Every structure is written in C-alpha cells, then in structure tokens.
C-alpha cells in the first residue's frame, strides 16, 4: 500500500508527526513507517477494505534528505494521521500506534521522533494541568520571582526524623519547595507514612517561623493502587503536592491519576527519560514527551538547566520551555517542527534542576526567564556551612536578580552567598 502523498496538505484535524529516519531508501522506509504505525502490516491482507484504507490511511507528506551516515541516507519526514485512527482520549493507545512498533523495524537504521502536532479535538480531550503556573504561584503566594526548590540529600539513607530536619533547615533558609528524590519511596529506613506526617509537621513549623508559604512534594511513585493509597495519605496529611516519576510510572498511570478526584499540584520528575530522549539514532525528543505530559496534566516538569550537569543545549531546553509555557507555539524547524495551539490547556511550570548552585542562577534566569522553578540539591546541601546556609545563598542569588544587583553586590549583604561564590568558582 502506498502512504506517500507529497502533494497532500495537512488539514487542521490531522495529528502530525515529524521524525528523523535513517535507511537505504528513505521513501520505502517512510512508507513502511506510516503503514506500521496505522493500518499496515508486512504483507497484503485479504481483510483490508477500501473504505478502511481511504478513511484511516496516513499520508507521508514531506520527505527531505538531510545527510548520509555510515552508508545510509538520513532524512526528515512528516506524517499526517487522520484522527479517526485513534481513541483520542487514550494516550497509551495513541502512542502504541504513532510511537510503537516502528522503533523495532529492521529496515530502520535510525528513527527519532522530534515533534507532534496535536489538533484541537485531540487537545480538548485532555484535562491538562489542574493548577498551572498561576495556580502554583497563588498557592505559594509568590507573584513574580522564580520559585526556589531543593531535594533532600542524600537521595536515600536518611531516617524519617533526619529527612524532616533537612527539609526544615532548607525551608527556614529560604527554600519554597522541598521534594523527595526520585528513588526515595517507602524504604525500611524511611517509610512513606511516617515521613509525610513528620515532614509536613516541619513545614508547618517553618511557615510559622518565616511567615512564608512552604510546600513538600512527597514521592508517591509505586504500583498504581499503592500510588493511590499514598496519595490518600498525603491528602489526609494536608499536602498540597505530590511528586510522580512520570516516565517509570507510565503514561497510563499519569493520565489516570490526573483524572482522579485529588486536588494536588502534580510535580513530574522525568527519571529514565534519557533512555528515550538522549540517543540521536532511536527515540523520542524531550520536547515531544513534554507536550504529552502537558496534555496529561502535570503542573511542574523538569526540562533541564542548559548550564548544569544534565544533557540538553540552550535551544533545545528553551524550545521545551516554550511548548509547556505558552498558549500558542510557532515552529522554528530546528527543535519545534509544528505550530501548536494549546487552546484552554494551562501551562506547566518548568523546573530547572541538576548541578545548580548560586553562581549559575543569573544565567539560568537569563536563558529561561522568571516563570521557573530553580531546584538545587547539592547547591543547597553542599554549602560549606550546611543546608540552611545553602538555602540562604540560593535565595539571595534569586533576590539579586529581582533587585537588579550582581551576585557580588548581593554577596556583600549576605555572607552565605559570599561563601558559596568562593566555594563554587
């Protein structure tokens, strides 16, 4: 069957996919990708009807050769899928088609999905974030400045009382948000039930002492029924937040959790994303994943730092930021390959985390703006004078930006920042 139609112009109702492919024959590969991701299989079948072919057939409407690698041609292709192909409010089902078997095809020597364009009917079938940026700011009573977050360190090993004490020290030092690390769940030395009540007790104490709103983001990642049980505990304990490791939990769990009756702000940690996003040969871009998570309804999402320890260049990270923050996004044909209208879907609060310390704060804000959660683990707890001093230094670095001061000027007012700048050259 032929799925290539280079004269086709996508209509507003099509779901579009853009990918880089590698193979001996780009046209043949593109044709097989389109078929495998929709109605095709490896041979002609007698059960195929003409009306199925006409109604459900996707169209490869662009094939552009962009290079050669190891004797194979490399090309950029775009495919338009009719929405009739999909159960549109079933993200796992949709992805089983457009991002499923195609990665295992022998003919493909490379296949990386770069972007999707979700049409209006598709977008409106999803809830999106419950709170979004404005809702988070309203909850924490922080109008304009970047939010400051930290992660309790070490990742695992602290006992419940120790964990809560570290969180308290961070809060009173100036941190707004404290979260569990991605691999802290309910280990023997720090059970979830005990940890959440004790840590929220310390949150209340920190709020009383500082006069500021503070929040704890407990990691409820677990098999789904247990995840719901932990969410119920978090609700009973008075937490405004939960954190979910969205990649390892799966698209189904994230979509289902958002459709529950909970009123949590959902913080999405992307642990394991690089297994899909980092390879330039096979996988899915972080931008494409971020668009999916915006639809599914997370309120906060890690996107990278550009200047920290995690992989991701400036243009790529800014493109991800654009897709989760803005109502309408225009293609740049470098990282964003489609215009995207998000209609009434709220924006996601971007999180910059990974190797962050006070000296990096001005550059991060310069690149990504003030609608940002700056999250520092080692950059808080690694301060020579401890967690509280590290929190004060990070908060002072943010305040320097708001006040129009250099870090060095602010350091003359805040000793903890001065020591941090001396420590992290």
Curated annotation (Swiss-Prot):
Stated regulation of activity: Reversibly inhibited by O(2).
UniProt site positions, description: Transition state stabilizer: 309
Cofactor binding: number and manner: Binds 1 Mg(2+) ion per subunit.
EC numbers: 4.1.1.39
Residues bound to Mg(2+): 179, 181-182
SUPFAM superfamilies: RuBisCo, C-terminal domain, RuBisCO, large subunit, small (N-terminal) domain
Active site (record annotation): 153 (proton acceptor), 269 (proton acceptor)
InterPro entries xrefs: RuBisCO (IPR033966), RuBisCO_III (IPR017712), RuBisCO_lsu_C (IPR000685), RuBisCO_lsu_C_sf (IPR036376), RuBisCO_lsu_fd_N (IPR017443), RuBisCO_lsu_N_sf (IPR036422)
UniProt GO BP: AMP catabolic process; carbon fixation
Cofactor dependence: Mg(2+)
Thermal profile of function: Optimum temperature is 65 degrees Celsius. Highly thermostable.
Positions carrying N6-carboxylysine: 179
EC class name: lyase
Keyword Magnesium among UniProt keywords: yes
NCBIfam families listed in its UniProt record: PRK04208.1, rubisco_III
Other facts noted in the record for this chain: Because the Archaea possessing a type III RuBisCO are all anaerobic, it is most likely that only the carboxylase activity of RuBisCO, and not the competitive oxygenase activity (by which RuBP reacts with O(2) to form one molecule of 3-phosphoglycerate and one molecule of 2-phosphoglycolate), is biologically relevant in these strains.
Name the UniProt record assigns to this protein: Ribulose bisphosphate carboxylase
Naturally occurring in which organism (per UniProt): Methanocaldococcus jannaschii (strain ATCC 43067 / DSM 2661 / JAL-1 / JCM 10045 / NBRC 100440)
């Amino acid at each position: 069957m032929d799925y290539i139609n280079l004269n086709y112009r996508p209509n507003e109702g099509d779901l579009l996919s853009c990918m880089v492919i590698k193979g001996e024959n780009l046209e043949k590969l593109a044709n097989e990708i389109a078929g495998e991701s929709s109605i095709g299989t490896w041979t002609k079948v007698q059960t195929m009807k003409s009306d199925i072919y006409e109604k459900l057939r996707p169209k490869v409407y662009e094939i552009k050769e962009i290079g050669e690698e190891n004797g194979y041609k490399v090309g950029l292709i775009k495919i338009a899928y009719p929405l009739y192909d999909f159960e549109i409010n079933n993200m796992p089902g949709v992805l089983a088609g457009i991002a499923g078997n195609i990665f295992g095809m022998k003919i493909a020597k490379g296949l990386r999905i770069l972007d999707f364009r979700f049409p209006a009917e598709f977008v409106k079938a999803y809830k999106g974030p419950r709170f979004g940026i404005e809702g988070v700011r309203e909850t924490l009573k922080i109008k304009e400045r970047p939010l400051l977050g930290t992660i309790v360190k070490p990742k695992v090993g602290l006992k419940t009382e120790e964990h809560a004490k570290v969180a308290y020290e961070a809060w009173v030092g100036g941190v707004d948000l404290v979260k569990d690390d991605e691999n802290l769940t309910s280990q023997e030395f720090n059970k979830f039930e005990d940890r959440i009540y004790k840590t929220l007790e310390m949150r209340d104490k920190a709020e009383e002492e500082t006069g500021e709103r503070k929040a704890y983001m407990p990691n409820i990642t677990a098999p789904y029924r247990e995840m719901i049980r932990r969410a119920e505990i978090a609700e009973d304990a008075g937490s405004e937040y939960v954190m979910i490791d969205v990649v390892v939990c799966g698209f189904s769990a994230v979509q289902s959790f958002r459709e529950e009756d909970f009123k949590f702000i959902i913080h999405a940690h992307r642990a394991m994303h690089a297994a899909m996003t980092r390879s330039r040969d096979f996988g899915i871009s972080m931008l494409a994943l971020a668009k999916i998570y915006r639809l599914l309804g997370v309120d906060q999402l890690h996107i990278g730092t550009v200047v920290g320890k995690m992989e991701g260049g400036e243009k790529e990270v800014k493109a991800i930021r654009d897709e989760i923050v803005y109502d309408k996004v225009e293609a740049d044909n470098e990282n964003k390959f489609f215009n995207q209208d998000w209609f009434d879907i709220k924006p996601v609060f971007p999180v910059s985390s990974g190797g962050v310390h006070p000296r990096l704060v001005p550059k991060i804000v310069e690149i990504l703006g003030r609608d940002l959660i700056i999250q520092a683990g080692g950059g808080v707890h690694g301060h020579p004078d401890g967690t509280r001093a590290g929190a004060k230094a990070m908060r002072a670095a943010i305040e320097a930006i708001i006040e129009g001061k250099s870090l060095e000027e602010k350091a003359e007012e805040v000793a903890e920042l001065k020591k941090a700048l001396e420590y992290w050259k």
